[in-house]
Amino acid sequence: MNNTHHHTNGYRTEKPKNEEDLEDPYANLSDFYKNHPAARNEACSSASNGGSKSVKMEPKVEKNEEFEEYIGDPVRLEDMEPFARPSLRDDAPLSSILHPDLDGIDPRIFFKDFNPNKTLRFSRLFAQNIKHTSRAEIWWASRTFSKHQRKKEPEEPLADDVIVGAKKLKLNIIEKVPRVMLADDEEERMRRPILTDAEEMAKKNEEGTVVQPWRTGPAKIWYDMMNLPMTSQAVNYGFKLKKSPQKVSIRSGKPLNYRTPDDLPSTSSGPAPNSAPFLDKVEVIDKSCEASTSEDILLPYQVIEWENDVILDGEEVKDQLLEEFSNGRGCGWIPTQYTRTYEHFVYAANNNAFEQMFDGKSAPINLTGPDSAILPTPGHSIFPSAPCDLDILPWETNIIWDADAMPSTLEPIDFLVDFQDDPLIYGMPEDRRHDEGPDHHHHHHHHRKDGQYTKKSKMILGQVQQRQKQEEDEQMESTMAQFTDNDPFNLSNDDYYVPKATSKTLSNNSLLIQHSTPATNIATHFFPTHPSAFRLRYWHRTPFTRRIVRHWQPMRFQPIQTPVKHQQRVAAMREAMRQAQGGGEVFYMRDVQDLSGKDETLVMIEYSEEHPVILSQPGMASKMKNYFKRRQANDSEPTFTFGELAFSHQIPFLGQLQPGQSLQSIENMLYRAPIYLHKRQNTDFLLIRSMNQWYIRPLPSIFVAGQQCPLYEVPSPNSKRATVFVRDFLFAFIYRLFWASDSSPRRLKMDDVRNAFPHYAESNIRKRLKMCSTFVRQGSETYWSLKPDFRLPSKEEVLSMVTPEMCCAQYSMMAAEQRLKDAGYGEKYFFTPENDEGSEDEVTIEDEIKCAPWNTTRAFLASQREKCLLDQTGIADPTGCGQGFSYVRVSQKPHKDENATPVPKKLVTGTNADLRKLPLKEAKQICRGYGVKEEEISALTRWEIIDVIRTLSTQAAKATKDGEIIAVSGMARFARGNTRFSSADMQEKYRKHCQRIFDQQNQTLANTDPISTDDDSTDADSDNEELASRLESMLEANKGKKNISMSEKAKIDFETEEKEREDLKRMIHGTTNQVEKGEKKEEGEVTAEEKKSASQFGEDVAMSASKISGITANQQLKIYRTCKGPDGKDVTRIEIVTRPQLIEAYTRIRMTRDDTFIQVYAQMDEQYKEEKRKKKRRLQDQIRRMKKNEEKAAHKVQKMTEKKVKPIKPPNPNLQKMRCSACHAYGHMKTNRNCPLYGKDPLTPLKEEDEGSTIMTSVSSASLVAPDAVQVDGTKVKFNLNFAEIRKEQNREEKLKRKLAKMAEAAVRERQMAHLMEYGGGASSSGGAGGGGSGIGGSTGGGITDNDDDDRFSQISGTSSFLNGPPGAIRGGNRNSSVSGSKRRSSMMPEEDYLQGPLKVAHRARADPKVVMSSMLTDIVNELKMISGSDAFVTPVNSKKVVDYYNIIKNPISLQEIKKKISEQSYLLRKDFLDDIKLMFDNSRMYNGDNNILTLTAQQMLQLAGKRMIEREQKFIGLEKQINPLLDTNDLIGFSYLLGEIVQKMKNIPKSALFHTRVDPKKIPAYYLKISDPMDLSIMEQKSKSQEYKSIDEFLKDAEKIYTNSVVFNGAESVYSLKAKEMFEMAEMLVKDQMDTLGELERNINPSAINDAAAAQRGLAMDSDDHMDEMEDHPTEEEEEDDDDEIMDDDMDIDATGYSYDHDDNVAVGQIFNDLAMSDSDEDERAEDVKRPANGDDNLLDSF
C-alpha cells in the first residue's frame, strides 16, 4: 500500500474499494424527473425524432457514467473530454444568442465540475429536497393544454426477444484516453482479500509508519481522546454505511445469468435508454435489529432549552434584541437594506439604528459616518474571505445527512493554509535583522539584549494592545459576574434585584440624524466658505436692519398674506410625491425651497446662553427626546406634544432626575441641551419675509434651551484640525467644480476658487490644483484641466470629506475668535497653555480665553472621559449668577495647601490618649454629646462605640475648612488619620455640585412666570471708575518696585495714602490751624465740624450742577412709561427721578430728539451696559492677577543689602575727545545712556551755507524741552518743569524767532522770484510765492499746530529743508532710522508724540460719468416709485390678466425696464430718459384714457421727473459733456476727441506696436543721427489730449511724418515702411469719412483764443523738475477754482483714501455703528451701506 501523502485538501482522489457497492445518488429519482426533457438536456422536438436523439446521445451517456464515479476529482483539462463549441452542437438551440467572444471559452476552466450533459451542481444539491407539490408542469413541449395522463407501461418482452433484437455495439475509440476513463485491472481486483471494514482499517493502521498531517492538526486533541495511534492511516468515526437495496424480479422464471439493469450503465439524469423494457423492481429494505447511532448521541435539540427561545410576541423581545445588537457581541451579522456589509452593520449596531429599522416607518436612514466609525474594532469578529476551492472541490459529499446511512466512509481532512489567506490565521512573522543568517541567532544570542530592536508587529499592534487588554478585563469581569449570578444553588433570583450597570452616556453619541439634502451637500447658502467679519460678529443673530423695511411708508399699505394657500399647495404636491413612490413616509427636505418656515409645524427654541458653544446651521436636523424616570412599575407615562418618550435609569446630563420627574431635551450630533416649554403670548405673532412677499403666522410653541452639553470638539484657531478642515474644504470645493463641469476633460477657472476662499493664498490654491489638474492657456482664456491619470473622487467621497458638523465647529471657532479680537485679545492669547496649580510660571490663561468654545468643549469632553473635573468657581458660567456649569477643567487630585501643617497618617491627631484606653463611661458620654440615643448606646458593645466615636470625629474634621488646624476639643477631637480630601471625596463633592446646579437650572428655566428686570444696578459707571482708579494706583505702586522689600513698600504706600488724604481734607475743609496748634484726635473719630463741612460740600456740588443745568435741587421729574402687560393690555408705570443731572439729560433729549432716536437710544443702553460689564470684569481680572503676583513675589523677596557707595571715577581723557553723532556733544557716543537723545531720532547736521538755517538749528535744539522734564510712569505722565524760567526763555526766543522767520521768508521769496523770472518769462510773482509758501508749509512732517510759534517754526524748518535737504531734515529726522528702531523703548516720552501727528493726504480719483449719471437717474426712479398709485407702472403688464394690452400698445415700457436700462448705462442723455417716462405716460393715455387715475399718476411721474431734471440740470449737462465731448461748447475739445479716436484706431492695426512709442536711443543710437524730427503715435495721442492740433493738416502731417521717417531710416521697401504707409492711409481714410464734422469744428475754432491759451501755457512752463513737482503738489487758489469748475459736482469725485475706520477709537466700542443706526437721514443709510459688508443671506426665502 502506498503511504505517500498527496495534497488533496482533505478530499479523496482514488477510487474506494467498495465503490461497486455504492449506489448512484440519483438512482431513486422518480420517473417525472428521469423522463423530463430538461433532465436529458434535449431540444424541443417531435416524437418522431426523439428516438434518434436518444440513440445519438448514447455514447456520451456511457462515457459520462465513468466520469460520474469520480465526481469532484481535481483533474486537469487535458484529462477531460474535449470541449465542443456550443455553436457546433445540435443539442444547444440557444447558442445563437451567445456572444461570439464567449463561444470558444470552456466553462470547465472556472468550474471543473461542469458538464454540458449533466445537471448543474446547484440543482443537484437541492434535488433531494424537492416536494411533490413543488414540481412544475412544463407545457412548452406539448401541443395542447390538457392534463398529462399516465401512460400504460409496455409489457416486458421476453429475454429471447431482447437477445435477438439487441443492436450491435458501436465502439467509441479515443486516441488519447483520459485517466478518469481507465478502470482497474480485473485480475488485480480479484486477488485482493475480502476484509471487513474493521479488519481493513486495522491493517492500514498497522502498516502505517508515517505520521499523517491530519493526526497532528487542529483535531489532535479529539484523536488523542479516541486513543488513536500517531501512525494511523484511517479513522473509524462510528458511522454506519447505507446498505444497497435488494431488487428482486417479479417474474419467477428468470435465468441466473440474466443481466439486471444495475449492471447496465446509467446516468445521473435517469436510467439508460435501453433499460425501459425491463420490469419494475421492488426495493426490499432489511429491517436490522441493531441500535441506531442516534440513541447513543445527544442531538442539539436535546441539550438546548429551545422552549425558552420560542418567540410568541415580538414586542417582548424587542428591547432584548436591540440591546444585544447594541453591544455588538454577536458572531455574525444580518444583511438588511441598510447594512449590506459587515462594516455598516457594526456602525448601525453602535448607533442604535436597528430601532429605526424596526419601527415600521419607511423613511430612509442615512448610515454615512466617518471612516473611523465603520472600521471594525477588536471587539467584533471579522469573517475571513471564503476559500476559492469551494467552487471546485465536492464539499457537499462530506455533509452528514444521516449518521446511520452514510453513502461512504469519511476520511480525515487535512487542514492546509495558503499564503493567500488572511495572515492573522498563522500570526505575524518575527522580524529579523538583515545581517543575520540562518545560524546567526544561535551563535550571538547571548550578545543581544532584550528589546535592542523593535519588531514591526509591535509597531503595528502597539496602539491596539492597550484596547485589547481593557476589553479582556471587561470580558473577564462580565464572565465572573455571570458565573456568580448563575450559581445553580442560588434559588433566590438575585440577578433580578441587581441594579442596572450605569455607563457614561455622555461620552458617545448614538443618535441617528438625517439632515436635509442641502445640508448634506454643504450648500453655499447655509455653509459659506468664508464668512465675513460682520456676519461673525452677529453669528446666528442677524440684526433687523432698516434696509429691510426701507420701502415701508407710514401712509402706504403693505400687503401681508397668510401662508394657507402655500401650505395647501405644498401639502398636495408632497402627497402626490408620496403616492408616486408607493406610499409610506417620504423624505421631503431635498431642496433649499423645502426649508421654509411657511409650512409644516414650527418650534421656536431660545438659547439661555448669550453665546452658545456650538450651533447647527439651517437644514441640519435635531431630535427631541423626553426622559422620564418612573416612581414604580405601574407609574403612568406623561404626555408631550413633541418628542419621543425614553425611559432611562440615567439621563445623559451632568445631573440626574428624581423618581417621577421628566425632562425634554434637544439632541443632535453637535450638542445635547435640556429644553423647557413656555407659554406664548396672545399678542405675539411670527412675521416671515420672502423675496417679494411678507407672511404672518401664529406664534409657534416656544421652548427655552438650557446650557449645552457639547458632543463635538471645536478646534482651536490655527490648529492642525482647523488647518486640515480648510484644506479638505478647499479640495471638496475643487472637486465639486470639476463635477459641475460639462467639458471633456473637466475644467475649472482659478477665479471661482479664489473668490470662494479669499483668505487663502493664491500660491496655496495653485499648489492644491497642481495635485489633480494642469494649467492650460488657450488664447486669452486660462483654466485648469483635470489630469487624465487622476481619479476624481466620487460624490459620496466628496461629501464624506466635509460634513455639516465639521463646518459648524469651524464656524463656532471663527465667531469666538472674532469676538475675542473685538475685545482686544490678540492671537498670542489664543494658545496660552493652562497653568498647573502647583506651577511657578506666571503666564496664565485669560478668563475670556478659558470661556472660548475650543477650551470649553475640550474640557467638557475630557470630564466625561473621567480625565478631569469641571471648575466649580463659575469662571465660564454663562449665566453669571451661579446657575450654570463652568466648563473649565480642574485636576482630579485634591488641591495641595503648602501652608497647611502635615498630619501624620494613622495617628490620633487631636489628643495623646489612645481610644483603646478610653473609659467606657466617658465614651458613652461622648456619644450622648454627638446626639446618639440612649437605647442605641446600650445596644452597642465597647468597640462599636469606639468605632462610632472615631467615625464621627473624622467626618467632623473633614467638614472643617481647608488649612484650619483641627481643634483639640469638640467633634474633631478624636479624628483619625489624614483629614485632607481624597479623590473619592472630591468626586462626591463634584457630583453633589453638579446635581445642585442641575436642579437649580431646571427650576429657574422651567418657571413660566415673568421676571422683572428693574432691579439692575445703576452704579455700574461709578464702579468702573473706582476700579480704574484702583488699577492706576496699583500700577503706579508696582512701577519700579520689583527690588523693594515689603516693609519699604508698605511704608511708601502709607505715605502716599496719607498725602492724598491730607490733600482731600484740605480741599473739603480748607486750610485749618489744627495741625499748627498740635491738636490730636483719635484715629477713626469724626467731629461735628467735619460732618458739617462734608454736608456743605455735597450741597455745593448739587448747587453747581443745578446752575449748569438750570434745575433746582428740589425739583423732581415724573416719567410715565407705557408697556404691554402679561395679558396683552397696556399698563402705565410712573418713575420719579430726583437727580438733577438725570433730569437735565431727560429734558434735553426730549426737546432735541424725535421719538425714533429715543427708541434706538434706549436699545443701545443694553449694549452699553454689556460693554461696561465686560470692562469691569477685565479690570477685576487684572487686579486679581496683580495681587496674585504680589503674593508670589512676597515669598521670594529678601531684604536688600545696603549698597556701598562707589567713588566716582575721573573722566577718561580719551572720551573727552569723542563726539556724539546724535546730539553733537563731546564725551560720549550716541549709544550711551548719558546722551540726552538716547533712544530718540538724532539731529541732522545742517549745511552752513545758509546763515538763517544755521542759526535756526541752534534755536531749535535749544528750544527742545530737557529730557528729564517729561517722564512716563505707568499710565501717568509727569512734568518736572519750572514754568517761570520756561516763560522767560520763551519770551527771549520768540523775538529771535520772528526776526529769523522774516529773514528766511524774504530770502526764499527772492530766490523763487529769480527762478521764475529766469525760466518762466514774466510769470506773476504772487502765484509763485503762493506755490512756494504752500510747498514750504506742506513739507513739514508734523503739519500745522495751534501754537503760532510752532507754525513759524514749521515754516522755517520747511524752508531749510527745501533749500538744504529733504523735507523734515531738521525736526524729526528720519523716523525710520536704524538707531531709533534698534533701541528699546525709553521711559522718556518723545516730544513729537505730543506735538505732531500723521499727515493725511487725500488723492481724489475721477469717477466714471456714466456711473454718476446712472446713480442720479436711479434716485429719480426710486422717488417716482414713492408716488401713490405707481405700483401699476413698476412691472410690465401681465398679458394673461390684460389680454388686449399688447394689441393696442406697440411700445410698452415700465419702471422695471427703465431701471434695467439705467443699470446697463444705456442712458447717455437726459432726453432718452425723459422720452421713456413720456412713453409710459402716452401708453397710459392711449389705453386708459386721459381721465383715468393711472393716467393722472403717470402725469405726476412725468412732471416730477422733469422737475428733478431742471433742478440738477447743470450737473447733467456736465456729465453729458464728459460722456460725449462733442456736446461741449468748446469746439476744440470735440475736435481733439475725434482725432484721439483716429489715433486709437491706428494703434489697433496689427503689428504696428513699433510705432506706438518712441525709438529707444540706447538700443538704436543711429536712429536720431538720421532722423532729426522723430514722430510716433504716443506723441500724436499726447498732442490730441493737450489740444495742440488746431487743423486737420497738422494732424495728417504728423501721421505722414511717421511714414517718411521710416522710409528714410529703413527704406521704401521695408516691412516697417509698408506698415507705416498702411497707418497713414488709415488716417487719411478716417479723416475723409469724418471730414464734414472735422471741417465744421475746425472752422468754429477761435484762433485768437487758442493763441492766448498757448501763450499762457508757455508762460507758466518751467524747465526745473523739482519746482514743477512742487507746483503740482500745491496748486494755487486760482487753479483750485478752475478744478472746481471742471468737476461740476462733488459727487463725481471719490475719495480714494477716505476716512480710516481702522485707526478710530470709536470703532472699537461700536460708537460709529450706533450713531449710524440712530439716524434717519439718507446720508446715514449710505454710510451704513459703506461700512457694512454685503450679506447675501438677507434675501433668503425663510426667516432663518
Swiss-Prot record:
Composition bias type Basic and acidic residues, residue spans: 55-64, 429-439, 1076-1093, 1186-1205
Polar residues bias spans: 43-52, 477-488, 1354-1363
Null mutant phenotype: RNAi-mediated knockdown causes embryonic arrest at the 100-cell stage, premature cell division of E2 cells, Ea and Ep, severe loss of polymerase II large subunit ama-1 phosphorylation and reduction in the transcription of several embryonic genes.
Keyword check for Nucleus: yes
Main location: nucleus
Stretches with biased composition (Basic residues): 440-449
Listed InterPro entries: Bromodomain (IPR001487), Bromodomain-like_sf (IPR036427), Bromodomain_CS (IPR018359), TAF1 (IPR040240), TAF1_animal (IPR011177), TAF1_HAT_dom (IPR022591), Znf-CCHC_6 (IPR041670)
Acidic residues: compositionally biased ranges: 1012-1024, 1666-1694
Annotated region (Disordered), positions in chain: 1-65, 248-275, 429-488, 1001-1024, 1071-1098, 1186-1213, 1319-1391, 1666-1702, 1714-1744
Biased composition (Low complexity): 1372-1381
Function field: The TFIID basal transcription factor complex plays a major role in the initiation of RNA polymerase II (Pol II)-dependent transcription. TFIID recognizes and binds promoters via its subunit tbp-1, a TATA-box-binding protein, and promotes assembly of the pre-initiation complex (PIC). The TFIID complex consists of tbp-1 and TBP-associated factors (TAFs), including taf-1. May regulate RNA polymerase II activity and thereby may control transcription initiation by RNA polymerase II. Required for early embryonic development. Essential for embryonic transcription of several genes.
Assembly behavior: Component of the TFIID basal transcription factor complex, composed of TATA-box-binding protein tbp-1, and a number of TBP-associated factors (TAFs).
Protein name: Transcription initiation factor TFIID subunit 1
The encoding gene: taf-1
